[in-house]
Amino acid sequence: MLRIGHRGARAYAPENTLASFKRALEIGVDAVELDVRKTKDKQIVVIHDADVKRTTNDEGLVSELTLKEIKNLSADGEKIPTLEETLDFLDKKVKVFVELKETGIEEQVLSMVHAKGVEKNVVIISFLEDALKKIRELDKGVETGLIYAKHKNPIKAALELKANYLFALYRFTHTANVQKAHENGLKVVVWTINTPEEVEEYIKKGVDGIASDKPDILTRVNA
């Protein structure tokens, strides 16, 4: 089972920063999950929200700020990294789930993945089905995953998108869903689990990976 640090180890360091990814590596994760968006000057940065307000000392839309302006922000004492910086830092040590938070960045993200030679380490995931469709049109080989909370038929959607993973909100994930996904050749990752009891529960359900803000709870279990 994949032990995945959600936005690094966001319970212990500012989310989506190199400090957070460093902490996740120190804990001993198998993978990290991160989010990407495009700046005003078309640079791919690692940040979850469309606005920088929640995670930095300023406010404004990522899409309306240049990379230089974003680099001047403080994320609780840390800097917002670019995707390139993050891939360099992780250096193929772990699998990387890259969540596309917007459309229109698919080609750029793929180009970076190929330039760094990390195609085998990266899984591109998104709630945005159009983004996943575009990724698959551009690249038949890279792994992808459909993220969802509530979805009428996520397995059907994932198969139509030729995805490899379902990235499911944990409380809507049941043993029968996991078994059906596996029967259809899909791997199931659940997010976001932050208690040891729930970790054990979802391991028993047969999931292929768990994403946690506290990834140390994942490294304590045998799976």
What would you call each of these model-derived segments?
Residues M1-A223:
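Phosphate-group recognition and catalysis centered on beta-loop-alpha active-site segments
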